[in-house]
């Protein structure tokens, strides 16, 4: 039987491991347990495996997640403003109502992702891929879509694109267009 003190130590160790960016934490009853927390994080977590994590409401602004794997993660209402996501994988992730304001997401992959009502104002999506992503009511105000592939994005409207910019390499659904970035 563990004493209250030992339980407190185990809990503290799990929290410290989660804050240090560990993907797994020790669980006293065997096997590793996945920690699904929504902490505040500001730092560098390049090439981290956060696939399948529950990060709803996480505060991760001003951070560097370049090359990280967020596939199948739940990031609803997460705040990742002013963060770096170059080459990150958000395939099949749920970013509903997430804040990606001024985020840098060049070459990020959003295949099958849910981005409904996400705010990506001022974000850089240069060469990002949005195959089968749901971008219904996503805010692209002042976003850079140069070279991005949105051909199969669902819910994309001309009104959204009127607030963004792109270039001749930007791929859009038939009938939609985007103004050139200066």
Model-derived regions, located:
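Hydrophobic helical h-region of N-terminal Sec-dependent signal peptides
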Residues: 10-14
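Bacterial N-terminal signal peptides that target proteins for export
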Residues: 1-9
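C-terminal segment of classical bacterial N-terminal signal peptides
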Residues: 15-23
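Tandem repeat scaffolds
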Residues: 2, 22-182
């Amino acid at each position: 039987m563990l004493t209250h003190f030992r339980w407190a130590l185990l809990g503290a160790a799990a929290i410290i491991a989660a804050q240090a960016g560990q993907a797994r934490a020790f669980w006293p009853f065997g096997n590793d347990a996945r920690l699904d927390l929504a902490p505040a994080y500001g730092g560098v977590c390049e090439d981290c495996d956060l696939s399948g994590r529950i990060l709803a409401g996480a505060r991760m602004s001003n951070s560097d997640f370049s090359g990280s794997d967020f596939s199948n993660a739940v990031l609803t209402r997460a705040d990742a403003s002013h963060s770096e996501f170059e080459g990150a994988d958000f395939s099949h992730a749920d970013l509903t109502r997430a804040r990606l304001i001024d985020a840098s997401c060049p070459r990020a992959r959003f295949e099958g992702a849910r981005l409904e009502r996400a705010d990506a104002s001022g974000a850089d999506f240069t060469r990002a891929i949005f195959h089968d992503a749901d971008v219904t009511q996503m805010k692209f105000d002042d976003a850079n879509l140069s070279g991005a592939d949105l051909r199969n994005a669902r819910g994309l409207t001309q009104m959204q694109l009127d607030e963004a910019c792109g270039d001749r390499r930007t791929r859009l659904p038939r009938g939609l267009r985007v103004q050139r970035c200066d």
